[in-house]
């Protein structure tokens, strides 16, 4: 039976394709927009049955051109939180997603899609409930509005709808994302280019490099998606983070120590890295004051209640694996 992955040449989409391949699934239609042509590299080691441009796909899918489709993993979106073109964002993230959803509902196809923790905006609690949702940018609003649609249609849906609010995802196949790539990716490249990693200094009561995020490995993101794929009776909107807030200092020290280990050098504590100039703190930029989240942490209550009980990688585990993967790509 056919599977479809939108955003298949993107970061999370390509990792889902690869994870499906590792289970023997190759009857996959990959959907994307390859105007940014270098994204093709994310699919070079993957097996797919067909590729379609996103515009052609949604029209053909609505006509049921692909026969029986078991599931759509809808990862395609504009994920640039700095994008200011509201019309583009709403067309790409909201209207397009509605069209894919409508086709899935009409055909009884499982619909697993990418939501975002950006929906929470400046909230201090990260629970999948309306009172904690207050997006700060049009990207977050586009995701929020679609989740609101999902809440309205889910009670009457005859097939699975599962949305995942991704927190700070890092891992292989993100190099095309540029400024929107993970901190781990940028720290890796910065250390190799300059011999040091730069982090923000003290801000809003947090010490240098102590601002925290829920950093989640794309490996775990793919596992959660496949868990729900395997349990089509489970529907809902779920936080998808490690459930653990860790400071940016943890990312930096892990990147530095993993690269040192690859060169046969011993690990250093954060204090030693700072003393040796391997980690440097820069003044917090004025442009980000009042617009910056100093803390995020996914509430996993709903995810665990839905039956996902596997542990999530820590920063130390996941970033170490990722740095070794990046090093192997050089």
Swiss-Prot record:
Keywords: Carbohydrate metabolism, Isomerase, NADP
Cofactor: NADP(+)
MF GO annotations: ADP-glyceromanno-heptose 6-epimerase activity; NADP binding
E.C. numbers: 5.1.3.20
Single GO biological process annotation from the record: carbohydrate metabolic process
Cofactor note: Binds 1 NADP(+) per subunit.
Reactions performed catalytically: ADP-D-glycero-beta-D-manno-heptose = ADP-L-glycero-beta-D-manno-heptose
Binding site for substrate: 168, 179, 186, 200-203, 213, 292
Keyword field contains NADP: yes
Catalytic residues in the record: 139 (proton acceptor), 177 (proton acceptor)
Principal EC category: isomerase
UniProt binding sites for NADP(+): 11-12, 32-33, 39, 54, 75-79, 92, 143, 169, 177
Pathway membership: Nucleotide-sugar biosynthesis; ADP-L-glycero-beta-D-manno-heptose biosynthesis; ADP-L-glycero-beta-D-manno-heptose from D-glycero-beta-D-manno-heptose 7-phosphate: step 4/4
Stored Pfam families: Epimerase
The organism's place on the tree of life at top rank: Bacteria
Family, similarity comment: Belongs to the NAD(P)-dependent epimerase/dehydratase family. HldD subfamily.
Subunit structure: Homopentamer.
Known role: Catalyzes the interconversion between ADP-D-glycero-beta-D-manno-heptose and ADP-L-glycero-beta-D-manno-heptose via an epimerization at carbon 6 of the heptose.
Domain free text: Contains a large N-terminal NADP-binding domain, and a smaller C-terminal substrate-binding domain.
Protein name according to UniProt: ADP-L-glycero-D-manno-heptose-6-epimerase
Organism from which the protein derives: Burkholderia pseudomallei (strain 1026b)
Name of the coding gene: hldD
């Amino acid at each position: 039976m056919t599977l479809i992955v939108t955003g298949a040449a993107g970061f999370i989409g390509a990792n889902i394709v690869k994870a499906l391949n590792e289970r023997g699934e190759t009857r996959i239609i990959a959907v994307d927009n390859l105007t940014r042509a270098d994204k093709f590299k994310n699919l070079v080691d993957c097996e797919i049955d067909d590729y379609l441009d996103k515009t052609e796909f949604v029209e053909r899918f609505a006509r049921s051109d692909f026969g029986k489709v078991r599931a759509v993993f809808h990862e395609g979106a504009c994920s640039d939180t700095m994008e200011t073109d509201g019309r583009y964002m709403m067309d790409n993230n909201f209207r397009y997603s509605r069209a894919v959803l409508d086709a899935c509902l009409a055909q009884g196809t499982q619909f697993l899609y990418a939501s975002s923790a950006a929906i929470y905006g400046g909230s201090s609690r990260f629970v999948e409930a309306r009172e904690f949702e207050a997006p700060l940018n049009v990207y977050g609003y586009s995701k929020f509005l679609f989740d609101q649609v999902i809440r309205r249609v889910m009670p009457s849906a005859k097939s699975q709808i599962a949305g995942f609010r991704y927190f700070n995802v890092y891992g292989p196949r993100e190099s095309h994302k540029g400024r929107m790539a993970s901190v781990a990716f940028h720290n890796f490249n910065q250390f190799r280019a300059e011999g040091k990693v730069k982090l923000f200094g003290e801000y809003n009561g947090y010490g240098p490099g102590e601002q925290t995020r829920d950093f989640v490995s794309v490996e775990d993101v793919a596992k959660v998606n496949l868990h729900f794929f395997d349990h089509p009776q489970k529907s809902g909107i779920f936080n998808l983070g490690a459930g653990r807030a860790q400071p940016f200092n943890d990312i930096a020290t892990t990147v530095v120590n993993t690269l040192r280990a690859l060169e046969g050098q011993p690990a250093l504590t954060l204090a030693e890295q700072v003393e040796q100039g391997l980690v440097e703190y820069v003044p917090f930029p004025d442009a980000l004051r009042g617009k910056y989240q100093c803390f995020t942490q996914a509430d996993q209550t709903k995810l665990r209640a839905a039956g996902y009980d596997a542990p999530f990688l820590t920063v130390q585990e996941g970033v170490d694996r990722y740095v070794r993967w990046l090093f192997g790509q050089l």
